[in-house]
Amino acid sequence: MKFALLSLAAMAVASPVAIDVRQTAITGDELRTGPCEPITFIFARGSTEPGLLGITTGPGVCNALKLSRPGQVACQGVGPAYIADLASNFLPQGTSQVAIDEAAGLFKLAASKCPDTKIVAGGYSQGAAVMHGAIRNLPSNVQNMIKGVVLFGDTRNKQDGGRIPNFPTDRTKIYCAFGDLVCDGTLIITPAHLSYGDDVPSATSFLLSKV
């Protein structure tokens, strides 16, 4: 039953949403392939979402950061090793170890390639679990470079006590919409789980306040 609900939700997430800042020509691979910027945004998309940044919140936050700080932001999505498949939601960490390792590698790449950058990060749905798993075990010198993290529809919210373990709560903001049952430790998808595009302005403001 839960798997069927996840499948149904995945189709809804993959459907076109309002065409505004969410759908632009962003590759989401700017840390790997581009120059260092003062701010680096690392994001993990939700299950079945396309590209490296997905569609629900990743591109919106990326674009809003770029509009606020023109020429100062590099956006990097977690992938291609992280395939954002549905089945990985049922693993003990809420995602695959491969995905967690890839995300951790991107944080370490930002720290080594761009030692003066300020890192901000985010994740939606399964992508939030990716961020929990990656950030909690990073070396302290890399964690210290992460100034803010925003998580939407966090599938690890209840399991990890409303926070990313081993990471400061004042640098973390978790968005859990009223009625979104994944925030209560289930994988039951309700319409609320698809509403997080509305939180992009607030999330962007939070990240900007940290850099």
Swiss-Prot record:
Signal peptide, first to last residue: 1-18
Entry-linked Gene3D superfamilies: alpha/beta hydrolase (3.40.50.1820)
One Pfam family per UniProt: Cutinase
SMART domains assigned: Cutinase
Reaction(s) catalysed (UniProt annotation): cutin + H2O = cutin monomers
Biological process, per Gene Ontology: lipid catabolic process
A GO CC term assigned to this protein in UniProt: extracellular region
E.C. number: 3.1.1.74
Annotated InterPro entries: AB_hydrolase_fold, Cutinase/axe, CUTINASE_1, CUTINASE_2, Cutinase_monf
Annotated localization: Secreted
One annotated GO molecular function: lipase activity
Enzyme class: hydrolase
Site (Transition state stabilizer): S47, Q126
The organism's place on the tree of life at top rank: Eukaryota
Isomerase recorded as keyword: no
Keyword vocabulary terms for this entry: Disulfide bond, Hydrolase, Secreted, Serine esterase, Signal
Cysteine disulfide links: C36-C114, C62-C75, C176-C183
Main location: secreted
SUPFAM superfamilies: alpha/beta-Hydrolases (SSF53474)
Family of the protein in this entry: Belongs to the cutinase family.
Purpose: Catalyzes the hydrolysis of complex carboxylic polyesters found in the cell wall of plants. Degrades cutin, a macromolecule that forms the structure of the plant cuticle.
Protein name according to UniProt: Probable cutinase 1
Species name: Aspergillus fumigatus (strain ATCC MYA-4609 / CBS 101355 / FGSC A1100 / Af293) (Neosartorya fumigata)
